[in-house]
Amino acid sequence: MEKTLKGIVLNSFDFRDYDKIITIYSNLYGKISLVCLGVNKTKSKNKYAINYLSYSNFEIFKAKNKLGLSKLKRSELINSFSHIATDFNLYVYANVLTSLVMNLEDHMKNYNLFKILKLSIFLINSKPNISFKVCILFMFYFLKIIGNQINLTVCGFCNSKINPIIAISFTNYCSSCKFCYFDDCLIIDNQLKNFINSIVKDDFIASLNQKISNQNLKILTKFVLSYYKDQVGIFTTSMYLLSTINQFK
């Protein structure tokens, strides 16, 4: 059956001489793979809309079952987010997002995730000055999607909601109040505490408007990357690059 949808290209690879298989995250079906016949031909009208990170309209022949591959009929490019490809750091930030979404099961639909992914890539492309913050916020937001949200607003040792948080533990992946503080905890300032509270309690856009220093973002980067690696079991190539590029040393 024919369907029209919007989607962001997460991945693509050549399939036979002139064909590709792409994976997109769409507004209707979540993550879905499409076989794109003839798109590697010079005269193909579909070749620009299926490049990595492209946000496009897709007309498809939907597979009858979840095990089958849907087929691309026609595509129309909406935004290529081309500036991302000109800067290594921006490319890493965007690839962290898409590599996380690629870990989802096919046909797992979440319209809020679709909106946040589209917004995040748009901001990384158009507002490089906040791209680092966008990437880290998305990583925390994605933890909510997969059921691994971290609540850093209460002490992870005594569960007190009264004792003020003063530090975070990179060993236990939790916050610590002044009565439970250990030597392996890192003391945090009020700005970082407020930002953490916003991540837990507010939506993505509200958290994006919270002020945070680059140094505090570096702390959160180290924390969330370690959490993904040790507790979630996800650590992609782009996440490794995020941990090693000079900005985060």
Swiss-Prot record:
A single GO BP: double-strand break repair
One annotated Gene Ontology cellular component of this protein: bacterial nucleoid
Cysteine disulfide partners in this protein: none
Entries under InterPro entries matching the protein: ARFGAP/RecO, DNA_rep/recomb_RecO_N, NA-bd_OB-fold, RecO
Keyword tags: DNA damage, DNA recombination, DNA repair
Record's keyword annotation contains DNA damage: yes
Family per similarity comment: Belongs to the RecO family.
Protein task: Involved in DNA repair and RecF pathway recombination.
NCBIfam families for this protein: reco
HAMAP family: RecO
Protein name: DNA repair protein RecO
Name of the gene: recO
